[in-house]
Amino acid sequence: KNGDLRTPVITIFDARGCKDHANKEYTGPKAGGADDEMCVKVAMQKIAVAEDAAALVLKECLSELKARKK
């Protein structure tokens, strides 16, 4: 019904001071400081929508908006 719904998913990697493993999340050029051990990943991921839950949220939101309008 809603097609291919996608949303941005943000993941933050902070490996400052971590010596347990080699950090391979970032493969670009090094900055030469603490920033070399941090990375932010943004990816669009498919999401599943529970139609019954979505309908309930919509109903509650509309009810709240109508109550505020009075």
From Swiss-Prot:
Primary localization class, coarse: plastid
Record carries keyword Transmembrane: no
Entry's localization field: Plastid, Chloroplast thylakoid membrane
GO cellular component: chloroplast thylakoid membrane; phycobilisome
The organism's place on the tree of life at top rank: Eukaryota
InterPro entries associated with the record: Globular_prot_asu/bsu (IPR011070), Phycoerythr-like_a_sf (IPR037011), Phycoerythr_a (IPR004228)
Gene3D superfamilies, alphabetized: Phycoerythrin alpha chain
Pfam families with a match to the protein in the record: Phycoerythr_ab
The entry's keywords: Bile pigment, Chloroplast, Chromophore, Electron transport, Membrane, Photosynthesis, Plastid, Thylakoid, Transport
Residues where mesobiliverdin binds: C18, Y26, K41
Binding site for (2R,3E)-phycocyanobilin: R16
Topology of the protein relative to the lipid bilayer: Peripheral membrane protein
Post-translational modification: Contains one phycocyanobilin chromophore, one mesobiliverdin chromophore and one 15,16-dihydrobiliverdin chromophore with binding mediated by both the alpha and beta subunits.
SUPFAM superfamilies assigned: Non-globular alpha+beta subunits of globular proteins
Other facts noted in the record for this chain: The light-harvesting system in Cryptophytes contains phycobiliprotein complexes. Unusually they are composed of either phycoerythrin (CPE) or phycocyanin (CPC) but never allophycocyanin (APC), with only one type of biliprotein being present in any one species. Unlike cyanobacteria or red algae these proteins are not arranged into higher-order phycobilisome complexes, and they are found in the thylakoid lumen.
Subunit composition and interactions: Heterotetramer of 2 different alpha chains and 2 identical beta chains which form 2 alpha-beta heterodimers within the heterotetramer.
Function of the molecule: Light-harvesting photosynthetic tetrapyrrole chromophore-protein from the phycobiliprotein complex.
Family: Belongs to the phycoerythrin family.
Name of the protein described by the UniProt record: Phycocyanin-645 alpha-2 chain
